[in-house]
Amino acid sequence: MNIQQALNHITKNIHLTQAQMEDVMRSIMQGEATEAQIGALMMGLRMKGESIDEITAAARVMRELAIKIDVSDIQYLVDIVGTGGDGQNLFNVSTASSFVIAAAGATIAKHGNRGVSSKSGSSDLLEQAGINLDLDMQQTERCIREMGVGFLFAPNHHKAMKYAVGPRRELGIRSIFNLLGPLTNPAGVKRFVIGVFSDELCRPIAEVMKQLGAEHVMVVHSKDGLDEISLASQTYIAELKNGEVTEWVLNPEDVNIPSQTLSGLIVEDSNASLKLIKDALGRKKSDIGEKAANMIALNAGAGIYVSGLATSYKQGVALAHDIIYGGQALEKMSILSEFTKALKEYANN
């Protein structure tokens, strides 16, 4: 099916089959569709509502065409990632959580990009922390294997997505492409914590991940609108485990974390985000640092749980709390910074 035929279906409110969506996605990623057609597809799918089959097929094609790193043999391999688009400008919780998860003994292959709606995307923050993202595939694999944490800068792995950059920027709306980033980790990861911008997406995205072969996934959205597990409200969760999707609601008190407002956790830029994260992960914390540490523990605990290192989410949060207060996560961040700098210096000599 070509993109014009697909648009005709979509305007009639007809969902595309997986085979049809795969055809359309390939035409986009091979440069055969015009920017007007891509924009129309984005808007049409958004207005109709993207189906599980459409999202699955688009993600499968993106995975197929990605420049991959194969570290799928590593035990406890996990990604923690969000769609963005919540507009809250919170400090970068998922990136901070990555260092906690890695310090706990799991391996992080974090797929990320620059800020979508926040002022500090994962790549913005990491560069601010002195972590070199300008690494080739072999160097990135070394980070993952030797340091237990590596960052996969999305544009380096999904070069064919360049054809959608213009329409996405010009339209400025949430679209299927916001959903695809978290679903298309190029490192063979099968265990995920995925934050989404609407609770209505939790179960569908869990079902998509099931079709894509994931093993254990928590898809989360908080009642106060975050694509994270929130410190300030209930969080809706769809969990894929043992081939089944279950839905549940989490209150922070369920895992011995007191509910607190998000005041003090909003940041202006990546520099402010990094400062808050270092406060939260350090041995001595300010009052706001303590609050940020609790927020990180809630999310890192999910990553530890889905990785297989903890048998329950509650146990994962307790382990994350111990790691944060022991200072190992901040040490992991510092070591990765030095390692990536050394890799680049070695390559340049």
Swiss-Prot record:
Cofactor: Mg(2+)
GO molecular function per UniProt: anthranilate phosphoribosyltransferase activity; magnesium ion binding
List of residues binding Mg(2+) 1: S94, E228
The protein's role, per its UniProt record: Catalyzes the transfer of the phosphoribosyl group of 5-phosphorylribose-1-pyrophosphate (PRPP) to anthranilate to yield N-(5'-phosphoribosyl)-anthranilate (PRA).
GO biological process, one term: L-tryptophan biosynthetic process
Species assigned in the record: Acinetobacter baylyi (strain ATCC 33305 / BD413 / ADP1)
UniProtKB keywords: Amino-acid biosynthesis, Aromatic amino acid biosynthesis, Glycosyltransferase, Magnesium, Metal-binding, Transferase, Tryptophan biosynthesis
Top-level taxon in the UniProt lineage: Bacteria
Residues annotated as binding anthranilate 1: G82, N113
SUBUNIT field: Homodimer.
Binding site for anthranilate 2: R168
NCBIfam families in the cross-refs: trpD
Binding-site list for 5-phospho-alpha-D-ribose 1-diphosphate: 82, 85-86, 92-95, 110-118, 122
Entry protein name: Anthranilate phosphoribosyltransferase
Enzyme class label: transferase
EC assignment: 2.4.2.18
Any one GO cellular component localisation term in the record: cytosol
A UniProt-annotated Pfam family: Glycos_trans_3N
Manner of cofactor binding, per the entry note: Binds 2 magnesium ions per monomer.
Name of the encoding gene: trpD
Family classification: Belongs to the anthranilate phosphoribosyltransferase family.
Keyword Amino-acid biosynthesis: yes
Pathway of action: Amino-acid biosynthesis; L-tryptophan biosynthesis; L-tryptophan from chorismate: step 2/5
Catalytic activity: N-(5-phospho-beta-D-ribosyl)anthranilate + diphosphate = 5-phospho-alpha-D-ribose 1-diphosphate + anthranilate
Binding site for Mg(2+) 2: D227, E228
